[in-house]
Amino acid sequence: MGRPLNRRRADGLPGIVDIGCVAGEMEEEVARPLNFAVVETGVFRSGFPEAGNFSFLRSLRLRSVVYLCPEPYPEANLEFLEDNGIGLFQFGIEGHKEPFDNNIPEEMIREALKVVLDVRNHPLLIHCNRGKHRTGCVVGCLRKLQKWCLSSVFDEYQRFAAAKARVSDQRFMELFDVTSLKHLSPPFGLLKSSAVA
């Protein structure tokens, strides 16, 4: 006999759940992508989603995915998006291994933020390969727009990047100018989150 379908965590999102069919012959595991987290209502972040994450992503009822890598999106992921009516916004930001490499394309980050700030794209998932550096920079710049203090922006970034935190990413977030985005004041309560994380 299958286990319950509606197991929920304290944050209201599905946890890791086994879904069995009535005969118990086939089970599907519902798992979150690597480094998954809620950024704000309707905005999520993660590492690259795999097929084992599709059931979980389906439960989020995503409208859009913001993909931050230059590599082509895999066919299986494209099919998942198409089958579920999810739009794809790709910003080909190169990954960098060097901790002091400072080649983060500011204009691409700005364009990605415009997509994130547009409530018509919500619910939305922001992701790169591991959900650490490129995703961390986009979310960090969003936090600056929310008027978070820099120490809180850096704390959140470091929670995901851990030992791989990069000085160049933090410097980029510190220097990122949000004034050109202020006219796009987020209508979904993001500016109310000026609290320290």
Predicted regions and their residues:
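Cys-dependent protein tyrosine phosphatase-like superfamily
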Residues: 1-126, 130, 137-197
